[in-house]
């Protein structure tokens, strides 16, 4: 859960998915 949220934030900020 926490890892998913962190990945989502990094994805939005870095725009690297």
Swiss-Prot record:
<keyword id="KW-0964">Secreted</keyword>
<dbReference type="GO" id="GO:0042742">
    <property type="term" value="P:defense response to bacterium"/>
</dbReference>
<protein>
    <recommendedName>
        <fullName>Brevinin-1DYd</fullName>
    </recommendedName>
</protein>
<comment type="similarity">
    <text>Belongs to the frog skin active peptide (FSAP) family. Brevinin subfamily.</text>
</comment>
<dbReference type="GO" id="GO:0005576">
    <property type="term" value="C:extracellular region"/>
</dbReference>
<keyword id="KW-0929">Antimicrobial</keyword>
<keyword id="KW-0878">Amphibian defense peptide</keyword>
<keyword id="KW-1015">Disulfide bond</keyword>
<keyword id="KW-0044">Antibiotic</keyword>
<comment type="function">
    <text>Antimicrobial peptide.</text>
</comment>
<feature type="disulfide bond">
    <location>
        <begin position="11"/>
        <end position="17"/>
    </location>
</feature>
């Amino acid at each position: 859960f926490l890892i998913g949220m962190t990945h989502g934030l990094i994805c939005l900020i870095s725009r690297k998915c």
